[in-house]
Amino acid sequence: MAEPRTLVLLRHGNSDWNQKNLFTGWVDVELSEQGVAEGQRAGELLAESGILPDVLHTSVLIRAIDTANIALKRAGRSWIPVQRTWRLNERHYGALQGKDKAQTLAEYGPEQFATWRRSFDVPPPPIADDDEYSQSADPRYADLGDTLPRTECLKDVIERMLPYWESDIQPDLASGRTVLVTAHGNSLRALVKHLDGISDADIAELNIPTGIPLVYRLDEDFRPIVPGGEYLDPEAAAAGAAAVAAQGSKK
């Protein structure tokens, strides 16, 4: 039997807008002090467990890039090769980007709020190109042209993420490399849904905490040997996931 492939998923550390309880999406916000500490702890967990990444795949958003850099430095792996892609970006929250989650919940009610936040195939209203939180003039997306997302549901995230998983991440895993993917709550939910075969309905209940490595051992068909993977700090992961689930109720 072939050796299991090792995939490490890491959601970026807590950001300034996580702390302010704002919809972030593709808005490029910095890590908070808590997020920096989470990145450092993630690196310590990787080093302590002996799970040392050989290659990094990350989004083009600074909160993921910085989290990965902080974690890899703490783990002594700053030198590994890196690939960045918009396909690992957070879900685009459309016109909700920059809006307060608690205010949105109060204004539109729990049913509409839950639909926009957790529905598999219903996106929020699209963002206008002249909105201050639009990415229409962002040079990192210049090659996307008219295909630049202006809103997304989780289904859209899966459709733009999976081609990259198959073309770039799977080959690294197949070569025997330990792969670190540092990304976002929804792009990682999209990947976990694919890996674990989670249904469209059940994925709404999955929450991924910030800054805690989630390790998957995959067989030769890239299927999890342990469904759901294993967090390197299970207690902190459970508390973090509960905090993510409660977003919107927080003032």
From Swiss-Prot:
Keywords: Gluconeogenesis, Glycolysis, Isomerase
Catalytic activity: (2R)-2-phosphoglycerate = (2R)-3-phosphoglycerate
Pathway annotation from the record: Carbohydrate degradation; glycolysis; pyruvate from D-glyceraldehyde 3-phosphate: step 3/5
Feature type site, description Transition state stabilizer: H184
Any one GO molecular function term: phosphoglycerate mutase activity
Disulfide bond entries: none
Pfam families in the record: His_Phos_1 (PF00300)
Enzyme Commission code(s) on record: 5.4.2.11
Protein's GO biological process: gluconeogenesis; glycolytic process
Enzyme class: isomerase
Xref: SUPFAM superfamilies: Phosphoglycerate mutase-like (SSF53254)
Residues annotated as binding substrate: 11-18, 24-25, 63, 90-93, 101, 117-118, 185-186
NCBIfam families found in the cross-reference section: pgm_1, PRK14115.1, PRK14120.1
Protein role: Catalyzes the interconversion of 2-phosphoglycerate and 3-phosphoglycerate.
Family: Belongs to the phosphoglycerate mutase family. BPG-dependent PGAM subfamily.
Protein name: 2,3-bisphosphoglycerate-dependent phosphoglycerate mutase
